[in-house]
Design a protein with these regions (language model features):
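Conserved S-adenosyl-L-methionine
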Residues: 66, 72-157
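Conserved Class I SAM-dependent methyltransferase catalytic core
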Residues: 219-253
């Protein structure tokens, strides 16, 4: 962090692994320095992971709803993985591949142990960078299996053909037998395009939500009004384009 032009900022070369890019304006450098003479800075090694795990508190609620991150408390993650073990068997992590296609910062995959079978994709590159940082601090993931991917807009094209999907994952979803051993494990976003006023014809769709996606346009005739729900678009694409895989989905339905 550098003090420059009466403010503290993060140099561009160090932006890859930080939570956000921001400049904090300091009117009086002496006052700022005196403040830290009274208080101790949090040690990086002790508090870094703690801050990363609570990163969602820095993100506005409406953005969290649209992007689908940060809505899986640890106890629910553990319970869902127990359900998977009960259903698929004790050795399921060695027998199945797992793709969280709405991974956020990877919280849902915490606790799984076979990193060679785990894939995580998320909408924002900043979240990918956070997962890379977590890998450096011991998270059980492979960097080449963590990637930026807009599940509702990007096509299933492998990296070797200029796309975004890891070649190993593309090979799985393209193979009829391997696809049967793929678990799409997600807690998808739940924002919808409409609101109460729009439902009764007196309001408008929210901009930048579900009606703007490629998947909404592709399957609107089949899912109708349900297409306003982002999670429904995730499910229809999985059902149509990754047939015979297993869907492990958080839902109140």
């Amino acid at each position: 962090v550098l003090f420059e032009n009466q403010g503290y900022k993060i140099p561009k070369k160090n932006l890859n692994n930080v939570l956000f890019d921001a400049t904090v304006t300091i009117k009086d450098k002496t006052t700022y320095q005196n403040f830290w003479k009274l208080y101790k800075r949090p040690p990086h090694s002790d508090y870094h992971d703690y801050i990363i795990e609570r990163r969602e508190l820095l993100v506005p609620q409406d953005i969290r709803e649209r992007k689908g991150a940060f809505f899986t408390p640890r106890q629910w993650v553990a319970l869902s993985q127990q359900y998977l073990t009960d259903y698929l068997g004790e050795n399921w992590q060695d027998e199945y591949y797992v793709w969280d296609c709405a991974a956020g910062t990877g919280n849902l995959l915490a606790g799984l142990t076979n990193k060679y079978h785990l894939f995580a994709s998320t909408l924002d590159q900043a979240d990918v960078n956070v997962m890379y940082e977590r890998i450096q601090h011991g998270a059980i993931l492979k960097e080449e299996h963590v990637f930026q991917f807009d599940f509702l807009n990007d096509e299933f094209i492998p990296k070797k053909q200029g796309g975004k999907l890891p070649d190993a994952l593309f090979d799985i979803i393209s193979n009829d037998e391997k696809r049967k051993k793929l678990v799409v494990y997600i807690n998808p976003p739940y924002a919808e395009a409409g609101n109460a006023k729009q439902t009764v014809g007196t309001g408008k769709n929210k901009t930048g939500t579900s009606t703007d996606t490629v998947i909404h346009s592709r399957y609107i005739k089949e899912i109708g009004m349900a297409g306003r729900e982002l999670f429904a678009q995730f499910l229809i694409r999985i059902y149509k384009e990754i047939p015979n895989c297993k869907i492990a989905n958080f839902s109140t339905l």
